Regions:
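Juxta-kinase regulatory segment immediately upstream of eukaryotic protein kinase catalytic domains
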Residues: 11-54, 63
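Catalytic-loop of the protein kinase fold
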Residues: 237-254
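Short beta-strand micro-motifs within the conserved protein kinase catalytic domain, predominantly
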Residues: 159-174
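Activation segment signature within eukaryotic-like protein kinase domains
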Residues: 225-226
């Protein structure tokens, strides 16, 4: 899919002049387009957006809000209306659209989470559309996330299933459809903490956790989460992709309770043009922007606004026991 910004005429009818807000959005789209072009110049991250099934926004029936970030809101997808097939449609994409349509909800009476939506979409929040600064950053983040997700695949990274048939820079019209997640590590850690307190009491040790089996199960789950998360981060680092916003709120669990890393708007790439000293063939230090991510979870260097990082620094993961 082309990432070029559509002409203003394609966004606003010619019968009336652009409003001030529309002019700001149009300028924001052009700025975000230039920023995105620079970001992906000489990139090894391929744009595979044309390989995804597409649905117009009006084909999707949305349900409740599942989550909300600084720029985007995530809704469950309750139903999809299929549009008439076009002669130019690729056979594989027709089949993919049909599959997503047929499996948009889990079967009633199937047991665990029966009738639930299988998919969720991420779109720009309404309030972001009204703020020029947030709008520019929001569509830029969506463009980065769309391209990154289109070119990565890992068991513990959320999978993109479909996209809108417009550029990510079109703002309100663009969305990413992904597998629905049911929990975050942030919420799970809170549950683990409460269970730990209950098991720590005399009553808990006597009746709730005979032989320490439940505590052992929880510890095993924590270690599995740490291992799977390290696997996902290792995959990204091998692709020279730096996630930059690792925190419990951006780590979820799917229907099978497998851990999934999501929200790639702040991801960046270690490419040769960012080398601190391109003339040094052994240089492993890259130029990056400081203060990117969530302050509470930033590394000391990032929080201190250091603009250099080595590709060989190790990821440290701490689990509570």
């Amino acid at each position: 899919m082309s990432e070029e910004v559509a002409d203003n005429a394609a966004v606003v009818p010619k019968s009336r002049p652009l409003t001030k807000a529309e002019k700001v959005q149009a300028a924001g789209m052009k700025y975000a387009e230039k920023k995105t072009t620079v970001f992906f110049t000489d990139s090894t991250i391929a744009s595979n957006l044309d390989d995804f099934a597409t649905f117009n926004r009006d084909q999707l029936k949305l349900g409740k809000v599942l989550g909300k970030g600084r720029f985007g809101t995530v809704y469950e997808v309750m139903d999809i209306t299929l549009a008439p097939k076009q002669a130019s449609d690729d056979t594989w994409l027709i089949e993919e659209r049909q599959f997503i349509h047929d499996h948009v909800r889990r079967e009633e009476g199937s047991g665990f989470h029966s009738g639930d939506a299988r998919y969720a979409i991420k779109i720009l929040s309404p309030e972001v559309m009204k703020d020029s600064g947030l709008f520019i950053q929001g569509i830029y983040d969506m463009a980065v996330e769309a391209r990154v997700l289109s070119d990565i695949e890992h068991t513990n990274i959320v999978k993109c299933r479909a996209i809108a048939p417009v550029s990510p820079l079109q703002g309100a019209e663009f969305y990413l459809m992904m597998d629905r997640l049911y929990d975050t590590l942030h919420k799970r850690m809170s549950k683990w903490g409460k269970k730990q307190k209950r098991r720590g009491s005399l009553l808990g040790r006597t009746f709730l956790d005979k032989g320490g089996k439940k505590e052992e199960e929880t510890h095993l789950k924590k270690m599995t989460c740490a291992y799977d998360l390290a696997s996902a981060m290792g995959y990204l680092h091998n692709r020279r992709i730096i996630y930059r916003d690792l925190k419990p709120e951006n780590i979820g669990f799917d229907i099978r309770d497998d851990i999934k890393l999501f929200d790639f708007g702040l991801a960046t790439e270690m490419k040769e043009s960012r080398l601190a000293d391109p003339s040094d063939e052994y240089c492993d230090v890259y130029k990056l922007t400081g203060m990117t991510g969530s302050p509470r979870y930033m590394s000391n260097g990032t929080f201190s606004k250091l603009s250099f990082v080595s590709i060989f620094r190790f990821l440290s993961i701490t689990t509570t026991t």
